[in-house]
Regions:
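C-terminal interaction-tip segments
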Residues: 228-252
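Long, polar/Ser/Thr-enriched low-complexity segments
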Residues: 1-123
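Charged linear interaction tracts used for macromolecular binding and regulation
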Residues: 93-237
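Short, low-complexity, polar/charged sequence segments that are solvent-exposed and flexible
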Residues: 38, 46-47, 81-83, 165-169, ...
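Eukaryote-specific, cytoplasm-facing alpha-helical/coiled-coil scaffolding segments in long proteins
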Residues: 87-91, 174-175, 248
């Protein structure tokens, strides 16, 4: 690339030269790159094709998982979540020790690597909720449960300034990444005050198909509200709501 000189600074493309502005100033570069046809057929780009196939598979898997909890993600996801989730699915696929490179997939990979994934970096569950909890997945019965120990909300919740209430939610997903089908179920508490009263032990349970052979996922989240004249408003339109994959059971 070359730096533009002179009084007149150009933008756009002229012939094979593209003019643009970057943090380094006004620049110019010549068109280049490899054609799609060459990447598709040239043996020297075999690795590129393999990487592309697996990346596409990861993107499709991430989209399917997001679809299974779309209603929760509307208020509990940051603007880079899609890319971050795809990156994690690439890691899952790369752990497939059965299939050759380019044909590796989620089913034969390590879906458990997704445990701990935060859908909202701006409101991580790991910092929003300090109360001990235990997630369990029973594949035989289809029961997916989160048990949360008693806690004092004012002490155990890191809530956005101005929050007066909170709600805890769980979601369970049974996902077939080969057929692009899924089953999901959610459960949630009523909206509760952020006060100094010790809560009762809390259990949120969902039930999906027993003896499933698909990867199973259990998600836990929390959202924050401000009460104004009896109406609850989500804080900053849910910008600080947390949602995390807390348990994964890959294929049996």
């Amino acid at each position: 690339m070359a730096r533009q000189k002179g009084l007149i600074k150009l933008h756009g493309t002229m012939g094979d030269i593209t003019f643009y502005r970057s943090k380094d100033g006004y620049m110019a570069r010549e068109k280049g790159g490899v054609s799609a046809e060459r990447i598709k057929n040239d043996p020297r780009f075999q690795r590129t094709r393999e990487n592309g196939a697996e990346f596409g598979r990861a993107g499709k898997a991430g989209k399917l998982l997001r679809s299974s909890i779309q209603s929760l993600l509307r208020t509990a996801a940051d603007n880079r979540m899609v890319g971050r989730l795809t990156k994690e699915f690439v890691k899952v696929i790369q752990m497939d020790a059965t299939n050759p490179r380019g044909l590796r997939n989620v089913i034969d990979g390590e879906a458990e690597l997704l445990e701990g994934f935060e859908f909202n970096i701006q409101g991580k569950l790991s910092t929003s909720l300090s109360a001990p909890f235990m997630p369990t997945i029973d594949r035989a019965t289809g029961d997916m449960i989160v048990n949360i120990d008693p806690f004092i909300p004012a002490e155990s919740l890191i809530a956005p300034s101005g929050s007066t209430h909170y709600k805890i939610v769980t979601a369970s997903m049974d996902i077939n990444f080969e057929s692009s089908a899924y089953a999901s179920e959610t459960n949630e508490t009523p909206v509760q005050p952020i006060d100094t009263e010790l809560t009762e032990p809390l259990q949120l349970s969902n039930n999906l198909n027993p003896d499933s052979t698909n990867p199973l996922f259990l998600v836990l989240g929390i959202s924050f509200y401000q009460e104004v004249n009896g109406t609850f408003y989500e804080m900053k339109n849910g910008a600080h709501n947390a949602l995390q994959i807390v348990k994964v059971s890959g294929t049996p």
